[in-house]
Amino acid sequence: MNAVDTQYLEKHTPMMRQYLTLKAETPDMLLFYRMGDFYELFYDDAKRASELLGISLTARGKSGGDPIPMAGIPYHAVEGYLAKLVQLRVSVAICEQIGDPATTKGPVERKIVRIVTPGTLTDEALLQERQDNLLAAVYHGKVGFGYATLDVSSGRFVVTELASKEALEAELQRTNPAELLYSEDFSEPALIASLSGKRRRPEWEFDYDTSYKLLLEQFGTKDLYGFGLGEVRLSLQAAGCLIQYVKDTQRTALPHINAITRFNQCDSIVLDAATRKNLELTRNLQGGSDNTLASVLDNTATPMGSRMLQRWIHEPLRNHNIIRARHDAIDELLDNGYHESLHEQLKALGDIERITARLAIRSARPRDFARLRQALALLPEIQQQLADCNSPHLKALSSHLGDFPEEHALLSRAIVDNPPMLIRDGGVIKEGYHNELDEWRKLSQGATDYLAELEAREKAATGASTLKVGYNRVHGYYIEVSRRESDLVPMSYQRRQTLKNTERYIVAELKEHEEKVLSSQGKALALEKQLWEELFDLLMPRLHELQAFARAAAELDVITNFAERAEQLDYHRPELTAQSGIHIEAGRHPVVERVSQTPFIANPVSLNPARRMLIVTGPNMGGKSTYMRQVALITLMAHIGSFVPAQKAAIGPVDRIFTRIGAADDLASGRSTFMVEMTETANILHNATPESLVLMDEIGRGTSTYDGLSLAWSAAEHLAQNLKSMTLFATHYFELTQLPDQMENVANVHLDAIEHDDTIAFMHAVQEGAASKSYGLQVAALAGVPAKVVQAAKHKLHHLESRDREEELPELRQAQLSMTMPETSKALDRLDTIDPDSLTPRQALDLLYELKQLR
């Protein structure tokens, strides 16, 4: 705990001294300080909460001579305010009264009982149902980065080692953490500058020995080799920080975090940050979820299935055996039609994954247990259907679903059919589960029946027709009579309260009854809470099996969903081959075909060792980018185990998918559009291999014509001749269509259009050969460019086309020639003979003048 200056505390009242001491425990979080029926915030917390939540900012007297800013929220509405703060990536410490005001002199004892941070949420009301909520930590070593993620709401704990800044950037985009922990001396702040929910942690929390010890304690093992974590030092340092942080915030045991896995990038097709963004896998270019691959593929029955599907989309596999097992399972579900009934059964399971996590940390609510009971009741039906399947994958999933007859029987006996949301007010434990509880409830209910008898008797005795017996928390039980009949009440009635139109009284008999009722109700509620806690103890021994059940059910949901999507959207099974290349017949863009107002034109693609690169030409709006993206998306879909939008697809080994499509200024990093484009191009040229799929769209547009053409030509030449990557290269530089004449593994394809007078119709059909023209003026007219401007452009175009190209573009031809000829220079030859480390400043200056004369 951070120390609080003693002299400073002495200036304040006892209550504010208590508040400031508690606030020092969590100085970087808002402190919700419980006072009666409100959570109060003071000082800067009050100002900040007022601004963030739109609540009134007031003052509470003075302490230390100054007015104390104050804001408050009702305790019963706290979840709504917490949800808003979590969305804003703001953390909150919740302080409750734990002492008894009746027996306490001075401030009631309080302590922080709960800490809510964006990355450690488990409460259903605070979580996005169909999105993972990850806490992450990153540690920068001398060579590379260690990265760890933990989903506290499921127990999923993953680490990975990353060799470069680019790899870390891609991993941050893939995992999209809600909260990121990093060390105080993290040396690459620019990498995480745009992330919200960052939290700096002291360097000692990343200490290797401390981290290793924490992990051993958490998993109850002697070493971590059984998890495959023998040589991942940096990521273990990040993982240790996560465990420490979660223990600090949750303040309870975490038995559901019982394993840790390593994410090996070599097991998956590598997607860099630009590719994940450009392909709009789970988020579109505007940051939303509409019109993404996930929005089309996700018709899952359960939230946990939806979250797993999104993880699969970001982790396309390279292991063909695992993928084929998924394809076989889909085939069988389609053949026997089980996917429809399984979908309905799975829909009733709910979110067992997160319910199990709340069970583990003892924060589950009554309705969680009711949903768990329902899920366990459905298991035999699901397993009965899967018993008839031959797919090894479906059989394995069925066995992992488990068997829980005793747990189902327990919950059926213990929990009422429709429990309330909270245990706080009782009414959760079913009648017949516990004899003593039933007795206290009967006593309480019998006392309630007595009130009706008392009311009838007193009405008859007094003759007051308005007489009734009531109850409130302030005055307890009372007899109420209208003021016009108050003269009818006997002397034995003691006036308790006068209202506008009524008088309220108590009698000795009613007071005795009140004590009896409150005693029986209190004892019943206390016993019910005790029995509720015992249910956690009875279910906890099956925690690991329940987690396995949740994982298997989620995967079964995804596979069933793939079968349903294949049937509804006319997807077909792709063939995964050992031969290099991608061959697709009648391929379609999975998203565009769903939102297009006109029938989608299917197109083929053929890439193989003799045809490594396609130069794609055609008009703007002709469909070049859509065509390229659909090839990448079909390839990715095949590798997550889905069927694909194509009549036929045969896809060989793929290690990476790169995209260089579109660009915008990166203002945060001070990079222009062209700089962003060149950075992405450089990444591709450094890392692409013969098994990489590369999409290059219009590179070189952000600079002069000659510079742009030179860069585009050289990049295409390098990809085709040296890297031999499978490449789709879209361009408006028609000079690039000459590449197939110089390189055997390059071919031209184009998307055509038809002109009629001044209009243009885009055919969207891919054809062999180069496009004849770009149709730029027609597209400008369609875009609404004023007719006068378009007409003037036509005149200028005719003028330029009529000029002698031999006179007009000599530099361009020279630029093209230089791309294919080695550059020689006396200055370069002289530079090759120089050792720069041995030069004195004077020698370096003399050499500079010498080189200037040689250029």
Curated annotation (Swiss-Prot):
This is DNA mismatch repair protein MutS. One of its GO terms (cellular component) is cytosol. The keyword ATP-binding applies. Pfam families: MutS_I (PF01624), MutS_II (PF05188), MutS_III (PF05192), MutS_IV (PF05190), MutS_V (PF00488). HAMAP family: MutS (MF_00096). Transmembrane segments: none annotated. One of its GO terms (biological process) is mismatch repair. The gene is mutS. Belongs to the DNA mismatch repair MutS family. PANTHER family: DNA MISMATCH REPAIR PROTEIN MSH1, MITOCHONDRIAL, DNA MISMATCH REPAIR PROTEIN MUTS FAMILY MEMBER. Keywords: ATP-binding, DNA damage, DNA repair, DNA-binding, Nucleotide-binding. One of its GO terms (molecular function) is ATP binding. This protein is involved in the repair of mismatches in DNA. It is possible that it carries out the mismatch recognition step. This protein has a weak ATPase activity. InterPro entries: DNA_mismatch_repair_MutS, DNA_mismatch_repair_MutS-lik_N, DNA_mismatch_repair_MutS/MSH, DNA_mismatch_repair_MutS_C, DNA_mismatch_repair_MutS_clamp, DNA_mismatch_repair_MutS_core, DNA_mismatch_repair_MutS_N, DNA_mismatch_repair_MutS_sf. ATP binds at G618, P619, N620, M621, G622, G623, K624, S625.
